[in-house]
From Swiss-Prot:
Organism domain of life: Bacteria
SUPFAM superfamilies per UniProt: Putative methyltransferase TM0872, insert domain, S-adenosyl-L-methionine-dependent methyltransferases
Catalytically driven reaction(s): cytidine(1402) in 16S rRNA + S-adenosyl-L-methionine = N(4)-methylcytidine(1402) in 16S rRNA + S-adenosyl-L-homocysteine + H(+)
Official protein name in the record: Ribosomal RNA small subunit methyltransferase H
Matching PANTHER family: 12S RRNA N4-METHYLCYTIDINE METHYLTRANSFERASE, S-ADENOSYL-METHYLTRANSFERASE MRAW
Length: 308
């Protein structure tokens, strides 16, 4: 456990604590509990706060449970996708919920585990957050039709040469299926000379999003979050696709006028805002945090305060 404490660094930890400063009691939902770093800090700082922690990774949840031992009786951990579990919690605890945290990053424990398939050197091609899920990265890469690969590379990886890469993968797998993440990573490296980022980065991102239905789950969550009352919602994203969804959802929450944009005059009474955006621009890690934890460099945090 001491090793986990030293290796795991929660992204934007001080900024998260600052965002939830007004919270003194009630329930906080950590929708992506991970190893429990943010939750542990919040429970330590706020003795009257209770926690509902959600994660689909059973292994990570076991570690989080051990780390939260000192707060026995103040937390309840749930397994499963966060959109579904959040909706259930909202139905039963709506008046008690004072804060909601969503950290959309992959934990260092998952990234560094060669048996999970998230990193370029893994000896599996998996990428599942939920190990009970039927779909894994190997099925996507070795079985998806070329048209489907093109779509996920274009939409989830924002890859310019999405057609070329999809066709090259199809040509290669017809001769010899990809056996693990290293095999795929080495192959992608042979196709590109891009030195700014590893050639496999965007393909791995796209496949991971597909395997875990990440954007669909985020959309479902953001739609459900509209029903929050008096709560602070804090979302940390790690790439432009996630951040755009969060940014647009927050703008939508803050709209006073809900008339058709083509209308010449407002007829809706112009008072429909669900609350206020607390971050005009996203909060990003300090240079010092990036220096200490390079994986934090793409993090962006947005915060919204819902009306009671």
């Amino acid at each position: 456990m001491q090793e986990i404490e030293s290796l795991h660094q929660s992204v934007l930890l001080q900024e998260v604590l600052q965002a939830f400063t007004p919270l003194e009691e009630g329930v906080l939902i950590d929708c992506t509990l991970g190893l429990g770093g943010h939750s542990k800090a919040l429970l330590s700082q706020k003795p009257h706060l209770k926690l509902i922690g959600i994660d689909k990774d059973k292994f990570a949840q076991e570690i989080a449970k051990e780390r939260l031992k000192a707060f026995e009786g103040r937390y309840n951990l749930l397994s499963g996708g966060f959109a579904k579990r959040f909706k259930e919690a909202l139905e039963t605890h709506n008046k008690e919920i004072k804060g909601v945290l969503v950290d959309l990053g992959v934990s260092s424990l998952q990234l560094d585990d060669d048996n999970r398939g998230f990193n370029f050197h893994s000896h599996t091609l998996d990428m599942r957050m939920d190990l009970k899920s039927d779909l894994n990265a190997q099925k996507v890469i070795n079985s998806y039709p070329v048209v489907a690969l093109e779509k996920i590379f274009r939409d989830y990886g924002e890859i310019k040469e999405y057609k070329k890469i999809a066709h090259k993968i199809a040509e290669r797998r017809a001769k010899k299926p990809f056996k693990d993440a290293k095999d795929l990573s080495d192959f992608l490296s042979s196709l590109s000379k891009n030195k700014k980022i590893h050639p496999a980065t965007l393909v791995f991102q796209a496949v991971r999003i597909e395997v875990n239905s990440e954007l669909e789950e985020l959309k479902e969550f953001l739609q459900c979050a509209r029903n929050l009352k008096g709560a602070i919602l804090c979302v940390i994203s790690f790439h432009s696709l996630e951040d755009a969804l969060v940014k647009n959802a927050f703008k939508d929450y803050a709209k006073n006028c809900i008339c058709d944009p083509s209308s010449f005059q407002c007829t809706c009474s112009n008072n429909h805002a669900l609350g206020a955006i607390l971050t005009k621009k996203p909060i990003t890690p300090s240079p010092e945090e990036i220096k200490n934890n390079r994986r934090s460099r793409s993090a962006k945090m947005r915060v919204f305060q819902f009306k009671p």
